[in-house]
Amino acid sequence: LHSRSRRQRQMCIRDRIGAGSFLFHSFAQAWAGALDVLFILLFTLLYLFAASKDFMGAPRSIALVITLGYFPFSIIVDWLTLPLTFLGSTRIYMPMLILIILFSLLLYKRLPIVSRGLAVGTFILVISMLARILDVPLCQKIPLGTHFVWHFLNAVMLAWMIEVYRRHIISQN
């Protein structure tokens, strides 16, 4: 992410996440919802690949296998979290949350600064998810709800995770 072209690509993905969310919340159509989810998934997969390669030191081929493993991992996590009905549709973010926690724990001794950065990302995501979970119940009392907090914290979390990666790459050079 330290070269200009990489930074531009990263910003392009980040901006597409925002555009997908904007389109979904503006038009509430299936195609817009698909774009919203697709861009988040794309970022997740790219970050997982980069984290596997650059944080964990995995060769590209192993990083690719880990990245593709996200799909069966997500299915298993989805199945295991089915009883947690209070999560509602926020449940789809559980695989990301678990992976960030897992990477943070695995990197605790080898890359403590990255580990702490990922732990901060975990905290931001948990608070963000809580805002999303509480949105509908709180709408009865607070008409504005908390959905905007979800989006704001997601933007903060996205920027933070990119910054954790950027700092790591710079520290390696």
Model-derived regions, located:
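Single conserved hydrophobic/aromatic residue that forms the stacking wall/gate
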Residues: 1-13
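Small-polar-interrupted transmembrane alpha-helices in polytopic inner-membrane proteins
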Residues: 10, 14-26, 45, 63-75, ...
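Membrane-interface helix caps and helix-loop-helix hairpins in membrane proteins
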Residues: 23-34, 52-58, 76-90, 107-112, ...
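Membrane-interface loop-to-helix entry segments
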Residues: 32-42, 84-98, 148-156
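Hydrophobic cores of alpha-helical transmembrane segments in multi-pass inner/ER membrane proteins
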Residues: 41-50, 95-105, 152-166
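Membrane-interface junctions at the ends of membrane-embedded or membrane-associated helices
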Residues: 51-62, 164-173
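Alpha-helical membrane segments in multi-pass integral membrane proteins
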Residues: 68-72, 86-134
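C-terminal transmembrane-bundle signature of multipass membrane proteins
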Residues: 121, 126-139, 148-173
